[in-house]
Regions:
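A short acidic, helix-capping loop that chelates divalent metal ions and anchors anionic groups
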Residues: 66-70, 124-129
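Membrane-proximal helix-turn-helix segments that form the acceptor-binding/catalytic region
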Residues: 80-83, 135-146
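Active-site proximal beta-strand in glycosyltransferases
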Residues: 6-7, 93, 110-126, 141
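Glycine-rich phosphate-binding loop signature in dinucleotide/nucleotide-binding domains
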Residues: 85-92
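Short His-centered aromatic/hydrophobic patch
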Residues: 96-102, 120
Length: 146
């Protein structure tokens, strides 16, 4: 029987999110074809591939997370990139990790015939405290959650 394909999308590939997503990919690789689309950050370990099972298919993203969720030109490029990755991988399930990948991914895959799961992890709007950026994230979470 053919394995189902899981596409993990992770912009915040560092710290606790890195540990969580790496372990999740490794735990799933026996039963699923796992694809990990990620963006490198300063917090990403230099030897990050050593933490991942060799059967995990790695896709480094160029546009996702470059400017967060507040730069329209960057966001459009990121959405196009996410749609191309989805087209290439043809996943059965897409699992979005953290706020930026969650926001852009839900925009990119809205209206598509995909099963999309979102895990926010750090809750960016809470960590930012009061202010304009925090309100944008809260609004985006509310709109995209429906």
């Amino acid at each position: 029987m053919k394995k189902k394909r899981i596409l993990m999308v992770c912009e915040a590939f560092g710290g606790g999110v890195f540990t969580y997503v790496s372990q999740l990919c490794n735990d799933m690789v026996d039963e699923f074809d796992v694809y990990l689309a990620y963006s490198l950050r300063p917090q990403t370990p230099k030897n990050y591939t050593d933490f991942l099972d060799q059967r995990v298919h790695l896709i480094e993203m160029e546009n996702v997370g470059v400017k967060g969720l507040t730069n329209l030109k960057s966001d459009i490029a990121a959405i196009k990139e996410l749609r191309q990755i989805e087209k290439d991988v043809q996943p059965d399930v897409i699992h979005l990790h953290s706020s930026v990948a969650g926001g852009l991914g839900r925009l990119a895959y809205k209206g598509k015939n995909n099963t999309v799961v979102y895990t926010p992890h750090g809750y960016a709007h809470i960590l930012m405290g009061p202010g304009k950026k925090s309100k944008i994230y809260k609004f985006a979470e509310k709109v995209l959650g429906n």
